[in-house]
């Protein structure tokens, strides 16, 4: 089983977005914050080219893969082999720039987003970085609800935080927790600090923001 840190503390914690401050001395009610920021959080719909390993897993029984490994011959298929994947993103400008995770759009042949009002827009990839797991998308349009990127240096361990995503094109999902640690580095990586949180992250929330 993957550790809680890797499974829940890394995916949506890449981004910290400044919002209203809460009083940690009293029970935290995030309802107003959710209402304020959720329109800027969108669902990302991706059509991806399948890798050789994914084709192997899909078409060859596990027992054969275990014994023969890469020596298994995959039957040739007509046309490109693709799959559909989902994630989340959020607007950082009114003119259509969004931030998500690199692993959400990696190997994508087509990217679209679903807005809070159910409109679907085609998105183009502006750029992405595998090491930091950050990607920037662009959609045509104007007057999108935007979020302001916060200052991670002002974030404190133990501070209440809220994770929001828009998985699978459904209504947004929200979960609350605290900042468990700052400046975490993934194993084998250097100079890529992450925020660790115990907020539960649902499937499809990758790329969504974390609010303080």
At which residue positions do the language-model features occur?
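Bacterial N-terminal signal peptides that target proteins for export
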Residues: 1-11
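Serine-dependent protease modules
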Residues: 24-212
């Amino acid at each position: 089983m993957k550790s809680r840190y890797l499974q829940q503390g890394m995916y949506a914690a890449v981004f910290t977005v400044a919002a209203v401050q809460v009083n940690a001395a009293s029970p935290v009610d995030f309802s107003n914050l959710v209402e304020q920021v959720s329109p800027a959080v969108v669902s990302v719909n991706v059509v991806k080219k399948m890798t050789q390993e994914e084709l192997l897993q899909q078409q060859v029984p596990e027992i054969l893969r275990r014994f023969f490994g890469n020596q298994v011959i995959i039957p040739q298929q007509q046309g490109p082999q693709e799959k559909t994947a989902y994630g989340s993103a959020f607007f950082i400008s009114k003119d259509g720039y969004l931030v998500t995770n690199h692993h959400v759009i990696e190997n994508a042949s087509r990217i679209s987003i679903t807005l809070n009002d159910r409109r679907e827009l085609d998105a183009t990839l502006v750029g992405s970085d595998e090491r930091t797991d950050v990607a920037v998308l662009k959609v045509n349009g104007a007057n999108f609800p935007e979020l302001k990127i916060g200052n991670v240096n002002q974030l404190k361990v133990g501070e209440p935080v809220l994770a929001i995503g828009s998985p699978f094109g459904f209504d947004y999902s929200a979960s609350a927790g605290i900042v468990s640690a700052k400046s975490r580095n993934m194993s084998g990586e250097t100079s890529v600090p992450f925020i660790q949180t115990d907020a539960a992250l649902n499937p499809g929330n990758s790329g969504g923001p974390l609010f303080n």
